[in-house]
From Swiss-Prot:
Record: residues binding NAD(+): 12-18, 108, 115, 132-134
Signal sequence coordinates: none
InterPro entries assigned to the protein according to its UniProt record, in alphabetical order: L-lactate/malate_DH, Lactate/malate_DH_C, Lactate/malate_DH_N, Lactate_DH/Glyco_Ohase_4_C, Malate_DH_type2, NAD(P)-bd_dom_sf
CDD domains reported in the protein's UniProt record: MDH_chloroplast-like (cd01338)
Gene: mdh
Residues given in the record as substrate binding sites: 95, 101, 134, 165
Catalytic reaction list: (S)-malate + NAD(+) = oxaloacetate + NADH + H(+)
Protein name stated in the entry: Malate dehydrogenase
Family membership: Belongs to the LDH/MDH superfamily. MDH type 2 family.
Purpose: Catalyzes the reversible oxidation of malate to oxaloacetate.
Superkingdom classification of source: Bacteria
Gene3D superfamilies the UniProt entry points to: Lactate dehydrogenase/glycoside hydrolase, family 4, C-terminal, NAD(P)-binding Rossmann-like Domain
Keyword list, A-Z: NAD, Oxidoreductase, Tricarboxylic acid cycle
Swiss-Prot/TrEMBL GO biological process terms: malate metabolic process; tricarboxylic acid cycle
Species this protein is from: Leptothrix cholodnii (strain ATCC 51168 / LMG 8142 / SP-6) (Leptothrix discophora (strain SP-6))
Length: 328
């Protein structure tokens, strides 16, 4: 029996990441090759953006995707999020030249408060929300706090790009296929302070830490490379990573919806105090997914260096949270 279509809302739909994302969702890469989708696309109510969105929709139509059951264009989150089952919040205010961090937080607080309220009012009660737009953890926290009638666990932030970047660096270092790496974790904020942790990782049952056996490489090469990869891409391409971010969003949502078969992945999720992180902090954790639910991998030993890294990324997140609390 064929499945009923699910509703997938995407914000910033005519942007670079949106363009790299929508065709893959419509082809079934995110929710499976048997799951029809209706795309509910949100762009800002500015003529240029709405015109660009029309062009993207024409292209989606021209692909004749068998799974694409409908496309809608919206300029208001209250209509874009109506009955949505999945919401990918990609659109955010980028940091402009000379813009202070406080201004960036305030501009995004406005966007994500409105979107959280709209989700609260009109989305499916089981909606799965992924915030991609930066600062992703804090934007997800703002949306969650603005949607008191939805379960906090429905709100997540994207750390999968950091996770995939870390896996790729480990594959290059060990000369092993990236798909063979298991039990990799990324802790904390989606920012250069994130802590990519391969202490538990294995390749073919063998410890990655033992294979690499180089703490200096970990500290001075691996962590800075993963942490500053976004900046390196901007320096090289002149624009921020879009295709790799879209790919990570697909990975995150696919695993959450369809499960990970016991494999660890990284998601930014609201803490309930795991590993001493204050409750409600939107924090990157290793998780497994099954039956549409994620579960934090608990009971992992945290050594002194790891604790130092976790404390640093937590301090940054707490600072961001303090920077927006008067706006909530």
């Amino acid at each position: 029996m064929s499945k009923s279509p699910v509703r997938v809302a995407v914000t910033g739909a005519a942007g670079q990441i949106g363009y790299a994302l929508l065709f893959r969702i419509a082809s079934g890469e995110m929710l499976g090759k048997d799951q029809p989708v209706i795309l509910q696309l949100l762009e800002v109510p500015v003529e240029k953006a709405q015109e660009a969105l029309k062009g993207v929709i024409m292209e989606l139509e021209d692909c004749a995707f068998p799974l694409l059951a409908g496309i809608e264009a919206h300029s208001d989150p209250m209509t874009a999020f109506k009955d949505t089952d999945y919401a990918l919040l990609v659109g955010a205010r980028p940091r402009g030249p000379g813009m202070e961090r406080a201004d960036l937080l305030a501009a995004n607080a406005q966007i994500f408060t409105a979107q959280g309220k709209a989700l609260n009012a009109v989305a499916s009660r089981n909606v799965k929300v992924l915030v991609v737009g930066n600062p992703a953890n804090t934007n997800a926290y703002i949306a969650m706090k603005s949607a008191p009638d939805l379960p906090a666990k429905n709100f997540t932030a994207m750390l999968r790009l950091d996770h995939n970047r870390a896996a790729s660096q480990i594959a290059a270092k060990t000369g092993k296929p990236v798909a063979s790496i298991e039990k990799l974790a990324v802790w904390g904020n989606h920012s250069p302070t994130m802590y990519a942790d391969y202490r538990f990782a294995t390749i073919g049952g063998e410890s990655v830490k033992d294979m690499i056996n180089d703490d200096v490489w970990n500290r001075d090469v691996f962590l800075p490379t993963v942490g500053k990869r976004g900046a390196a891409i901007i320096a090289a391409r002149g624009v921020s990573s879009a295709a790799s971010a879209a790919n990570a969003a697909i990975d995150h949502m696919r695993d959450w919806a369809l499960g990970t078969n016991g494999a660890w992945v990284t998601m930014g999720v609201p803490s309930k105090g795991e590993y001493g992180i204050p409750a409600e902090t939107m924090f990157g954790y290793p998780v497994t997914c099954e039956g549409g639910e994620y579960k934090i991998v608990e009971g992992l030993p945290i050594d002194a260096f790891s604790q130092e890294c976790i404390n640093k990324t937590l301090a940054e997140l707490e600072g961001e949270k303090d920077g927006v609390k008067h706006l909530l």
